[in-house]
Amino acid sequence: MSWGTELWDQFDSLDKHTQWGIDFLERYAKFVKERIEIEQNYAKQLRNLVKKYCPKRSSKDEEPRFTSCVAFFNILNELNDYAGQREVVAEEMAHRVYGELMRYAHDLKTERKMHLQEGRKAQQYLDMCWKQMDNSKKKFERECREAEKAQQSYERLDNDTNATKADVEKAKQQLNLRTHMADENKNEYAAQLQNFNGEQHKHFYVVIPQIYKQLQEMDERRTIKLSECYRGFADSERKVIPIISKCLEGMILAAKSVDERRDSQMVVDSFKSGFEPPGDFPFEDYSQHIYRTISDGTISASKQESGKMDAKTTVGKAKGKLWLFGKKPKPQSPPLTPTSLFTSSTPNGSQFLTFSIEPVHYCMNEIKTGKPRIPSFRSLKRGWSVKMGPALEDFSHLPPEQRRKKLQQRIDELNRELQKESDQKDALNKMKDVYEKNPQMGDPGSLQPKLAETMNNIDRLRMEIHKNEAWLSEVEGKTGGRGDRRHSSDINHLVTQGRESPEGSYTDDANQEVRGPPQQHGHHNEFDDEFEDDDPLPAIGHCKAIYPFDGHNEGTLAMKEGEVLYIIEEDKGDGWTRARRQNGEEGYVPTSYIDVTLEKNSKGS
């Protein structure tokens, strides 16, 4: 099968077909180009997505620690590598497929143009030979007709008796001339015809088949090139499949690395404050002052003793406690015992069972009208708030447990830096010894400035370590003391109630007097206690805010930098001081945020 023999007369068709082949090649090249743009945009969008969800971290504290977060960031890293492989696909297609197609299309256009020009030239040469043969043929035909006319004229004159001999001779000469010219044109025509037949045979059996064969080979090479580009298009994708598979395997491994128990433990390590939960509230017996005995002589005495006891045990307690519900405490009474409800004593000391309706009625009223005294645990999150203000050097703005961890981390970092400086000092000393033994290697004095700087760094780091260790010891000792103090309070069931700090810690002061309401006669009206206000505590000093404090949490007092407040209760060791504004608003503020000045007659109270 050859175009030269099968399609010898289809020059125009082959012209159109080869042009279509080049157009198809360029169309496929355009397709590859658009695919490359898609891959590039896809990779760019993936990288932007990774950059959006994996921002740069400014410090180590912001690095992800939870296994779910670490797994997500590992997935983002794998996705970033996956985006890189999409870029590799685009680059491979651009180099191996698109670039090769464009170069080959340019070469095809040049080669096709050359072959078509050769075919047209061969056709033009054959047409020229045909015209020469046709002209000689027409000239031979014309000379033959002229010779026939000359012969007819000669015969007519020769048969005419009236014609002169000269006319006959002239006609004969004219006939001979025309006959000679006809013979010459005949020979010319025969030569041109033979030449044309030869050129035509050469054209259709040699020249055109050769040109068409070259066009056929060109078109077949175009088809082969398309096949190679198809394969290269797929190979560009197949080459990155192993790496993409590794990226996907990395994502699967990241998913398997998620440990929910470890994350839960990290939550505990991150937010554990170190405080202990508040202890149980002691039972407050408000019914003992209304107990009566059968003897009339003991009624008034019991009232007086009860009144004295209540007045003594309740004096000033309202000042020392931040009431969670904003109400004045009910009168304090000795603990209620089962025998006090049902027994009475006679003057001679004998006891007998009795049933009093009044205490039961009072207890029922307490159950129906009394509000639950539940401490607020929202304040326990005081030390976890990220809005506390600027971080302090000793981390006193953090809860004890978090403060201990931060200090321990800083001590570990300082120890590592100290070890580096110590190693550098040892290296400098060794180098100095080498220089002293071999002066030609260097000047020992040149190492003295660096050695002095290293020693200064070591001293500075040791001081920092000592300072942080002192803070750490303070935190550990304070946490242990607070637990012992709360345990002692729970065992002794002190009637005095501890002050609740904003963190939820309690500070019990057994030496503080407790003030109760005035002695009332008749039935006790529980609604009076609901709406009475506490007397304001006296100021024991004043303070000035060093840092601003928002005071969003319950029981705290917001303050601005430079604001002056009254001190109404000192820091009991939990890092909080109770203060009051001039408008009477009270609350707790961080002790490390204020500059405290106490009155001389109030210090130590």
From Swiss-Prot:
Any Pfam family the entry gives: SH3_1
Gene Ontology CC: cell cortex; cytoplasm; cytoplasmic vesicle; cytoskeleton; cytosol; intracellular membrane-bounded organelle; plasma membrane
Organism: Homo sapiens
PROSITE patterns: F_BAR, REM_1, SH3
Quaternary organization: Homodimerizes, the dimers can polymerize end-to-end to form filamentous structures. Interacts with GTP-bound CDC42. Interacts with DAAM1, DIAPH1, DIAPH2, DNM1, DNM2 and WASL/N-WASP. Interacts with ATG3. Interacts (via SH3 domain) with ABI1, WASF2, CDC42 and WIPF1.
Molecular functions per Gene Ontology: cadherin binding; GTPase binding; lipid binding
Database matches in PANTHER family: FCH AND DOUBLE SH3 DOMAINS PROTEIN, FORMIN-BINDING PROTEIN 1-LIKE
Gene responsible for this protein: FNBP1L
Region (Disordered): 476-539
Protein name (database record): Formin-binding protein 1-like
Family: Belongs to the FNBP1 family.
GO biological process terms on file: autophagy; cilium assembly; clathrin-dependent endocytosis; membrane invagination; plasma membrane tubulation; positive regulation of filopodium assembly; signal transduction; vesicle budding from membrane
